């Protein structure tokens, strides 16, 4: 798929989910490079930079997209010629997509060990990583029940309950505001993440923080399922995560309320680290305090690069 179409599909939520948009961005840049017909390296660098900015501009909050794009373009500045750069981009993209897919599988295996037979689980939005944990536990023969939130305004919970229902899992969809009411029946909560800061705060679909607070109040374990490429290197240097806001038309129809009334429609919220029991990653189960260590010592420049 070309860069323009990919950017539009990410922006209009046709492609959604932090991991999915990261893989889509990597794939689009690979296709762009593969179809490039020019031979001038300076022009190629300029064009690939434009393509990169289009992709990154489609979803400003998700660091997964940023890391996926930069992993795909890693080393291009040192390429000898266009052919070398194209080969490098295609190889990087293939590697990133394979590692991203593999990470979800590993998270499923690791996280499923935290689920016991008979558990009642709650999840929010539509996280591939969280679903991997839940479905892996079910495939292991554990009898579980799942409460999945509707996740307004885009109702990503519809995708989640369809996935779980087709797998044969006992699933109930609840309205977002029923989270606190239902939490007394829940044993564990599993959610995904769009971005995790260096100090362990979790940026995810709006209402995640309320769900975490309800779990904390009820003393229910709250797990974040996240690939490590969703850890934000920019927050190491003090940058904050921009919270994307979307159109009021996702909430109300034009003319439904007076023009003088404002509508605030943030896509994400921030869950403080203290409400997170553990982060389940492809590297293992870790505390929120371990995010800094992973960014600095284990991943380093292999995936993350500093924007100049």
Residue ranges and their predicted role:
Residues 18-20, 121, 125-130, 153:
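Gly/Ser/Thr-rich loops at beta-strand to alpha-helix junctions
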Residues 14, 33, 37, 52-59, ...:
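Structural signal for hydrophobic packing residues in well-ordered secondary-structure cores
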Residues 130-139, 212:
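Histidine-anchored nucleotide/phosphate-binding helix
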Residues 1-87:
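Long amphipathic alpha-helical segments
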């Amino acid at each position: 798929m070309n860069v323009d179409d990919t950017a539009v599909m990410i922006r209009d939520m046709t492609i959604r989910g932090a991991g999915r948009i990261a893989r889509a961005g990597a794939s689009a840049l690979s296709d762009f490079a593969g179809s490039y017909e020019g031979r001038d390296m300076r022009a190629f660098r300029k064009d690939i930079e434009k393509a990169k900015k289009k992709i990154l501009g489609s979803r400003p909050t998700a660091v997964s997209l940023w890391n996926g794009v930069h992993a795909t373009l890693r080393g291009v500045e040192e390429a000898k010629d266009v052919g070398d750069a194209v080969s490098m981009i295609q190889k990087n993209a293939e590697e990133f997509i394979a590692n991203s897919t593999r990470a979800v599988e590993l998270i499923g295996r690791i996280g499923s060990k935290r689920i016991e037979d008979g558990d009642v689980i709650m999840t929010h939005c539509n996280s591939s990583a969280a679903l991997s944990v839940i479905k892996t536990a079910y495939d292991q023969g554990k009898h579980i029940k799942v409460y999945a939130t509707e996740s307004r305004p885009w109702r990503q919970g519809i995708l989640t309950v369809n996935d779980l229902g087709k797998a044969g899992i006992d699933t109930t969809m609840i309205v977002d505001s029923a989270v606190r009411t239902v939490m007394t029946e829940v044993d564990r909560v599993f959610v995904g993440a769009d971005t995790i800061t260096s100090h362990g705060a979790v940026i995810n679909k709006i209402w995640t923080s309320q769900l975490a607070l309800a779990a904390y109040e009820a003393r229910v374990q709250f797990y974040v399922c996240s690939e490590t490429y969703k850890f934000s290197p920019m927050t190491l240097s003090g940058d904050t995560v921009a919270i994307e806001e979307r159109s009021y038309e996702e909430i109300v129809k034009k003319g439904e309320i007076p023009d003088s009334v404002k509508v605030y429609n943030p896509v994400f919220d921030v869950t403080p680290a203290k409400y997170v029991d553990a982060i389940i990653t492809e590297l293992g189960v870790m505390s929120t305090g371990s995010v800094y260590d992973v960014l600095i010592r284990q991943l380093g420049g292999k995936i993350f690069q500093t924007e100049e």
